């Protein structure tokens, strides 16, 4: 009985370590990188900011980019 419990604990520890390694190995998205499909993947000092692409007032697309936190971008005409 002790052997079964010990084996289960060892397997649980191995699976936990593998999952933790996979999560820490993921690369974050750098400044101005597209994060449309992965909104939580920007590097720690960045935020995923999304914009609607309009054509004649109708939304045709949505694009997201990793941008600096607390920075406002304005369009110059």
Swiss-Prot record:
Query: Does this entry carry the keyword Isomerase?
Result: no
Tissue expression remark:
Expressed by the venom gland.
InterPro entries xrefs: Spider_toxin_CSTX_knottin (IPR019553)
> What's the domain of life for this entry?
Eukaryota
Q: Which UniProt keywords apply?
A: Disulfide bond, Secreted, Signal, Toxin
PTM annotation, UniProt: Contains 4 disulfide bonds.
Propeptide residues, chain positions: 21-26
Q: Which GO terms describe its molecular function?
A: toxin activity
Q: Which Pfam families match?
A: Toxin_35
Q: Which GO terms describe its cellular component?
A: extracellular region
- Record's subcellular location: Secreted
According to the record, the signal peptide region is: 1-20
Q: Which family does it belong to?
A: Belongs to the neurotoxin 19 (CSTX) family. 10 (U11-Lctx) subfamily.
User: Can you name this protein?
Assistant: U11-lycotoxin-Ls1a
Per the UniProt record, the source organism is Lycosa singoriensis
